[in-house]
């Protein structure tokens, strides 16, 4: 592995809209109590396994920022440098933002639902500017004209990977342990790149909330262990299965 640092990926803890099974995207919702507990536990896992981050990267969304703060506090690393970028934001779900996943699936059918939710290159319909769940008036995104109106995973790859290559890789090359606290789809975009996954294979990848995923990288920034290693594999498997089942009607 040489002097290359270690990369730790962490999806935010369960959010209010995760719990309600709503498409969230760029809507800025908070964490549930379960999500806050997941964040604290993630920091404990980092400390227990002596995987203490030197620098943190996160998005501009509070569910990631709060998760990062709670995790760092739990690991006694609140003092490390923090860098935030909209490029780490969740995928923008367009006009689906705020809609119930099960109701959307029932209305449009399984095939269309899965294409919008998990395909690599099929974006949902555009969100209307000025509508309840759009971000065009949000001051966080004034320098990017309010941000996208919809995105597919390919769009997330296109906005995130240049930031990873131009900014984050420098810390890894310097031998630092880098913690990225982000979102299901921004992390899927990065994992696709790291593990060189095909457009077809990425469809089946689900990332659970609140469980650190460790990547040891070689000098070419390729994973020593393909797919990385979850610090709590059993909980990660259960969490990924729960993510995969989203869209099922409630009993």
Swiss-Prot record:
Q: Which SUPFAM superfamilies match?
A: Phosphoglycerate mutase-like
First-tier enzyme category under EC: isomerase
Detail which positions bind substrate.
11-18, 24-25, 63, 90-93, 101, 117-118, 184-185
Q: One biological process GO term for this chain?
A: gluconeogenesis
What's the family? Belongs to the phosphoglycerate mutase family. BPG-dependent PGAM subfamily.
Record: active site: 12 (tele-phosphohistidine intermediate), 90 (proton donor/acceptor)
Please give the Pfam families that the UniProt record associates with this protein: His_Phos_1
Query: What terms describe the molecular function in GO for this protein?
Result: phosphoglycerate mutase activity
Q: Which domain of life is it from?
A: Bacteria
| NCBIfam families linked | pgm_1 (TIGR01258), PRK14115.1 (NF010713), PRK14120.1 (NF010718)
Q: What InterPro entries does the entry give?
A: His_Pase_superF_clade-1, His_PPase_superfam, PG/BPGM_mutase_AS, Phosphogly_mut1
What is the purpose of this protein? Catalyzes the interconversion of 2-phosphoglycerate and 3-phosphoglycerate.
Q: In which pathway does it act?
A: Carbohydrate degradation; glycolysis; pyruvate from D-glyceraldehyde 3-phosphate: step 3/5
Which reaction equation describes what this protein catalyses? Answer: (2R)-2-phosphoglycerate = (2R)-3-phosphoglycerate
Q: Which UniProt keywords apply?
A: Gluconeogenesis, Glycolysis, Isomerase
What is the official name of this protein in its record? 2,3-bisphosphoglycerate-dependent phosphoglycerate mutase
Locate the site labelled Transition state stabilizer: 183
